[in-house]
């Protein structure tokens, strides 16, 4: 979020990515958009993303917000909803998967307006790897319309596949950047893997 509470597309405010911008110097939206990322990439705001999604109807995204505090989550998603409303593009939330990191975050976000697609990612809250813990989280997802869960690839066990299938909730893992590992995970019951490489599935 910018200094004025507007949502832009950046992982965090660490220094060195954009001139004059750091955790100690959080920019306005205009200042952010005026400073190339790593001296070569074009910065984008959430509004820019919406306009891009309108132009290209095959784009779908997973949100990757970095806050779990209820007040900040509320401010962030309210700003996103307001941007979409002002542009007349609220329907584009149908092509977004809202990533949540805990049951509390889900309830905070869902209170603002139920989104069509959610995914529950475990890394922020932690996951002890037991089958019982997985069942509890998948039960929460099923009861609340959350379509999938994501965990670190090294936490996945083939024994989870039956649990996931019985719950009707899909399981995903991150981050996998080699084909053999990805194929093995998919064969063991994972629905999909997160990767940095678009061509991971190609021959």
Where are these regions (language model features)?
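Metal-dependent phosphodiesterase/phospholipase catalytic core, i.e.
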Residues: 3-6, 11-117, 147, 151
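C-terminal active-site rim and adjoining tail of enzyme catalytic domains
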Residues: 120-203
């Amino acid at each position: 979020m910018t200094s004025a509470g507007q949502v832009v597309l950046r992982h965090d405010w660490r220094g060195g990515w954009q001139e004059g911008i750091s955790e100690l110097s959080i920019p306005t939206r205009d200042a952010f958009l005026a400073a190339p990322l790593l001296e070569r990439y074009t910065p984008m705001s959430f509004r820019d993303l919406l306009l891009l999604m309108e132009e290209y109807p095959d784009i779908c995204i997973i949100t990757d917000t970095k806050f779990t505090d209820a007040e900040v989550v509320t401010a962030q998603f309210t700003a996103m909803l307001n941007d979409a409303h002002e542009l007349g593009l609220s329907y584009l939330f149908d092509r977004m998967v809202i990533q949540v990191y805990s049951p509390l975050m889900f309830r905070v976000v869902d209170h603002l307006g139920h989104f069509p697609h959610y995914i529950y990612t475990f890394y922020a809250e932690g996951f002890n790897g037991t089958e019982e813990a997985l069942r509890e989280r998948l039960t929460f997802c099923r009861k609340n319309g959350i379509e999938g869960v994501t965990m670190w690839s090294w936490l996945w066990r083939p024994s989870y596949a039956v649990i996931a299938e019985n719950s009707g909730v899909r399981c995903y893992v991150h981050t996998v950047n080699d084909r053999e590992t990805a194929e093995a995970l998919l064969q063991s019951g994972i629905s999909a893997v997160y990767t940095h490489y678009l061509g991971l599935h190609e021959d």
